[in-house]
Amino acid sequence: MFRDKREVSSIRADWLELICRLDENMKSFDSTSEINKIRQQITEQCRQAGSRKTGIYRLSVPTGGGKTLASLNFALHHALETGKRRIIYVIPYLSITSQTVATFRNMLGLDADSNIVLEHYSTAGLQNSSNTGSAGTSEEENARERQRKLASERWIIRLL
């Protein structure tokens, strides 16, 4: 079923550390504008909802209302409170997937090679796969690409 039978250890994420990073980065936002005050209220409600039991929740907020970071706050707090091993973040449109992943990485202080966030969808990584093993591609880049492929096959990353 898997292309590569090598063992890949599961990656551990420290939810509390990620929450602290997110909180620290969110402090830099302008708290005086009306829209940011509303975004902060939405985020705080999501953060508090993170302590609820596991279930299906809906976040209905207009465009520009801060859904991306509010829902990440919920997910991280919920994972911490309920002992979840991973977060699976489902987005309805491919067009916003890369943007959301970039926001997550930026706000959590993670680089593109981080093993905490995995961007997994039908075309993820295809831009790199044609270069794998070609001249000009370093062994380190090839190793990172193999690791990304294994992670996507086995979902060993904590924030998908």
What are these regions (language model features)?
Residues M1-L160:
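N-terminal helicase ATP-binding lobe
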